[in-house]
Amino acid sequence: MVDSVYRTRSLGVAAEGLPDQYADGEAARVWQLYIGDTRSRTSEYKTWLLGLLRQHGCRRVLDVACGTGVDSIMLVEEGFSVTSVDASDKMLKYALKERWNRRHEPAFDKWVIEEANWMTLDKDVPQPAGGGFDAVICLGNSFAHLPDCKGDQSEHRQALKNIASMVRTGGLLVIDHRNYDHILSTGCAPPGKNIYYKSDLTKDVTTSVLTVNNKAHMVTLDYTVQVPAAGQDGPPSLSKFRLSYYPHCLAPFTELLRAAFEGKCQHSVLGDFKPYQPGQAYVPCYFIHVLKRTA
């Protein structure tokens, strides 16, 4: 339905099933350059995530949107037992390559990587003994990739229910989304640096909002990225690609998350890794939800 009104992705990207917006391979390659490796993660993000997981005694972590594996690699290096899944085989190949290259390291030899779909996650990923993972992470605005094809958010509810089912009692779900409240009210993303990536390759990001029947239905981001030349002497080139997102606003997404846990959770919201208060002066780029299953 979404493609009948507006082209949601770069040409060549798969249109059936759970949309893989990186299926043409080129978008996945450019995205890998854009986000970089573990060294490209901001120190604030790394310190926050590792501190959160260790504070709650998390050891077994499920990354349900691992992409190229950059977060999972960081967690494996830090001693966590990691299972990494993604719906895009083009993205997973980078994670698989890293695991192969470091297979002689015991931690990487034990790293589990699987292709999986949020809509069937409970069937695609076996739970560890003890009734679930200590922590499930879905970061980098990943969940917003899932569109609302039926117009009733039933896919969102099912996917979140499946993701929540992987969290053990006392375990955490850490999931985020861009500040779509600000994007929808202003038409632009909040000013400020990316809290996750230190990439200096981004030359431009253009934001568009699609409204259907007076309701925001989709946000597209058109990236222009400077790609380094293959050789030492060649000039860099500019690559363009488009990604589309469902605009999850803070209040309704909070309701979806609590429903996924049937209300049996503790829930807190951060704005760019800091406690968030509605109406505060600072406008965050991302909202991060931390939910702890209570029963």
UniProtKB/Swiss-Prot annotation:
Inhibited by 5-methyltetrahydrofolate monoglutamate and by 5-methyltetrahydrofolate pentaglutamate, inhibition is much more effective by the pentaglutamate form than by the monoglutamate form. Two molecules of 5-methyltetrahydrofolate are bound per tetramer. The binding sites are localized between subunits. Inhibitor binding may preclude movements of the polypeptide chain that are necessary for enzyme activity. Catalyzes the methylation of glycine by using S-adenosylmethionine (AdoMet) to form N-methylglycine (sarcosine) with the concomitant production of S-adenosylhomocysteine (AdoHcy), a reaction regulated by the binding of 5-methyltetrahydrofolate. Plays an important role in the regulation of methyl group metabolism by regulating the ratio between S-adenosyl-L-methionine and S-adenosyl-L-homocysteine. (6S)-5-methyl-5,6,7,8-tetrahydrofolate 2 binds at Y6, H217, R242. S-adenosyl-L-methionine binds at residues 22, 31, 34, 41, 65, 86-88, 117-118, 139-142, 178, 223. Its EC number is 2.1.1.20. Belongs to the class I-like SAM-binding methyltransferase superfamily. Glycine N-methyltransferase family. The lineage of its organism: Eukaryota, Metazoa, Chordata, Craniata, Vertebrata. Its main location: cytoplasm. This is Glycine N-methyltransferase. The gene is GNMT. The modification Phosphotyrosine is found at Y34. It is found in: Cytoplasm. PROSITE patterns: SAM_GNMT. InterPro entries: Gly/Sar_N_MeTrfase (IPR014369), Methyltransf_25 (IPR041698), SAM-dependent_MTases_sf (IPR029063). Keywords: Cytoplasm, Folate-binding, Methyltransferase, Phosphoprotein, S-adenosyl-L-methionine, Transferase. GO terms for cellular component: cytosol. One of its GO terms (biological process) is S-adenosylhomocysteine metabolic process.
